[in-house]
């Protein structure tokens, strides 16, 4: 799987100065999302119209996602102010053989979406996550009690890592947090949007049997992402041959 690699490389270059997070334990999760009013919050990262970027990218290339690690550009939660720009980017390295099998079984899109839905299923204690996948926005509200109890990006990263590793296809997890006010969030959002477009295109690839590019809803993405059109045509041929 190489179709995300160009955007992942851009993100890694843009975020290369991140400070490693040293993690001893995961932040506690709860069974149900907690109601958290703003009056009870110590922090709202990405709120009040500030930049708030959330993205998930996939690769099988170990040179892009070498190992599991988590980094931060900006201040840790204890030093953040109430309203702060925010980004959380997750990059997953997947097992190539397992991904090839998912492609053959036409289950790749559902697998990628299932991994994405981790953020909806994982409920962190003292946190309220608001997501707009259409706008690549992710706003994180954190309670005063959670801050008092020592919540950190390191603990949050460890909790997400454990959730992603529940998938046997996941070989490595990298999380990049950004709270630096002067960071170029627009560039990060552009990469986030393109990666979401790629994921959306997989749904069309595995459902559509047309080879007429002019009638294809994914044409604009295929025109720019190397490998997508070839994958689509390969699936069309399989469908036409009864495979």
Q: Model regions: which residues?
A:
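Charged, amphipathic alpha-helical stretches
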Residues: 1-67
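Intrinsic-disorder-associated interaction segments
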Residues: 1-4, 28, 80-87, 101, ...
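Long, solvent-exposed non-transmembrane regions
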Residues: 12, 34-40, 44, 70-96
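N-terminal alpha-helical interaction blocks
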Residues: 83, 87-167
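A broadly conserved sequence feature marking short terminus-proximal activation segments
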Residues: 140-201, 214
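Cysteine-cluster motifs in flexible loop/terminal segments that predominantly coordinate metals
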Residues: 191-232
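Short microdomains enriched in Cys/His and/or Lys/Arg
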Residues: 228-243
